Design a protein with these regions (language model features):
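Long, non-catalytic protein-protein interaction scaffolds
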Residues: 1-137, 142-144
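Intrinsic, low-complexity terminal and presequence regions
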Residues: 138-141, 149-156
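Helix-rich, well-folded core regions that mediate interactions or catalysis
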Residues: 156, 160, 164-165
Length: 165
């Protein structure tokens, strides 16, 4: 389904397909925890956690959290744009002030800048994801439409869990 909606780049389509598989387990949406063990549910909190000057204990931690921000924002803007659209009206929350597309693109760029040693081979993929972020969002919107047409059980579970948080 993903390859059909994102046919231009097989590696990007495979990455996004794996992202959807990973997020089948809703707990994976919120896998990032702060140093106290608190689950981070907002991109604003994740951005603070990823900053090596503030919370991130290492550049490895910065990369880990930034990669999650990328995936999280891409997933939500692509599969649940109606949820993202409600964020500004949800009161005094960090995420009411954050542009998910900009945060996702910036984080993919940062992850793509980690291009040494073990990350040398995957860095170009993350740079392409940054460049093609909106295209990927559109592709995921089309996947969402396909899933809704099928009344896919997992899509309905994701949707229920998001709006119940």
């Amino acid at each position: 389904m993903v390859a059909k909606e994102l046919p231009a780049d097989d590696e990007v389509a495979a990455y996004i397909g794996n992202l959807l598989i990973d997020f089948v387990h809703v707990d994976n949406l919120y896998r990032i925890r702060n140093y106290r063990g608190k689950r981070l549910e907002e991109v604003g909190e994740m951005l603070v956690e990823s900053n090596p000057v503030l919370e991130a204990s290492s550049f490895e931690r910065e990369r880990e959290v930034r990669k999650h921000i990328d995936d999280y924002t891409l997933f939500l803007t692509g599969m649940f744009p109606e949820y993202v659209a409600t964020l500004p009206s949800r009161g005094l929350r960090l995420d009411s002030l954050i542009d998910y597309v900009k945060a996702g693109k910036e984080s993919y760029r940062i992850v793509g800048a980690f291009d040494q040693f073990e990350y040398r081979h995957v860095a170009p993929l993350f740079r392409r994801l940054a460049e093609q972020f909106e295209y990927c969002v559109h592709g995921l919107n089309r996947v969402k439409s396909d899933l809704e047409a099928l009344r896919e059980e997992q899509y309905q579970l994701w949707k229920k869990n998001l709006f119940d948080v």
